[in-house]
Design a protein with these regions (language model features):
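A conserved acidic, glycine/proline-rich C-terminal tail/linker
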Residues: 248-275
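Glycine-centered flexibility motif
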Residues: 163, 214, 238, 243, ...
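HotDog/MaoC-like acyl-thioester-processing domains
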Residues: 1-30, 35-37, 101-201, 267-270, ...
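Short flexible/disordered coil segments
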Residues: 130-131, 229, 260
Length: 302
């Protein structure tokens, strides 16, 4: 990754002010002409934030986590969401086009995040990867550091961009990058070594996560908002799903979940009662019909 000077940005603080600016950017991106500069080289974006005890407790309450083992919760999400909005504008992608495909999360500091600490988040746009003839994946890396410059967490996200022109996709510089095939069938359902955990996804979980993370995408706030984007009902955010799973695995094994690789295959509806299946290093989330919603790998440690 070439060394580039960071671009500073501020994340809006107030609830109403943030929501107003967020939805303004959403509808602005929908109405604007797409320039589709997906292979742009953008400088990293930087912001700082402060983790209060109240904010920490709000994240714990969201996931129902009450143990002392530090977990890889995405406290830095508000910075990442706002940076994503800026980058989407720079590369000319409408907000309504994207869908979260996968995340890779690594908590580098074994003590995790600390209350009453200042942190910096650097968001890097990593470019584009092939998906299919008319779709690609765009990639982002968020690096969170403390005031001493130590890396606390790395989070890499892949977003799906569909409905592109075949000729446009063909001319992108993606040499040597082959499309990745994803398994869409549950493998742990009949595995005798897998534990089974019943989850309850509340009707307003996406809304609660949105208020904490800044991801106020209408698809996750209400069924009406979801239908505006062509979905039958609302579903929780990808990183909301990740945080819920991290909490459940940490509680189940009574240890810290330090590393997670997760693929989002089908929406996790709200409300719903999916089942989390897990072995010592793999997990799957399935619905009542046995459809695979989410799958991934993880590492836990004490």
């Amino acid at each position: 990754m070439a060394k580039q000077k960071s671009t500073w940005f501020d994340t809006p603080k107030s609830g109403f002010g943030y929501a107003s600016k967020f939805y303004y950017k959403v509808f602005q991106s929908i109405s604007q002409d797409e320039s589709l500069s997906l292979d742009s080289e953008l400088p990293p974006m930087k912001t700082t934030w402060f983790l209060t005890e109240k904010k920490m407790q709000a994240w714990l309450d969201l996931t129902g986590y009450d143990l002392s083992y530090p977990q890889a919760f995405t406290f830095s999400a508000p910075a990442g969401v706002w940076a994503l909005m800026q980058v989407l504008k720079e590369i000319g992608i409408s907000f309504g086009r994207i869908m979260h495909l996968s995340s890779r999360l690594l908590m580098i500091n074994k003590d995790g995040f600390q209350v009453d600490e200042h942190y910096s988040t650097y968001v890097h746009y990593l470019g584009v990867k092939p998906h299919s003839k008319r779709a690609v994946m765009i990639r982002f890396l968020s690096v969170v550091k403390n005031v001493r410059g130590q890396d606390i967490m790395h989070l890499e996200d892949e977003l799906y961009v569909a409905g592109l022109d075949e000729e446009f996709v063909a001319q992108l510089d993606m040499k040597g990058l082959a499309p990745e095939r994803r398994n869409t069938k549950a493998l742990l359902t009949n595995n005798p070594m897998a534990d089974s955990i019943q989850l309850t996804i509340g009707r307003s979980l996406g809304q609660k996560y949105g208020k904490l993370s800044g991801d106020l995408n209408p698809m996750h706030i209400s069924s009406i908002g979801a239908r505006l984007f062509g979905h039958k009902s609302s579903f929780i955010q990808g990183l909301c799903t990740l945080n819920v799973i991290v909490a459940e695995l940490g509680r189940h094994w009574k240890s810290s979940i330090r590393s997670v690789e997760i693929e989002f295959l089908r929406p996790v509806s709200q409300p719903s009662k999916p089942t989390l299946l897990c072995t010592l290093d793999h997990f799957e989330l399935v619905d009542r019909e046995g459809n695979l919603l989410v799958s991934g790998r993880y590492i836990c440690s004490n």
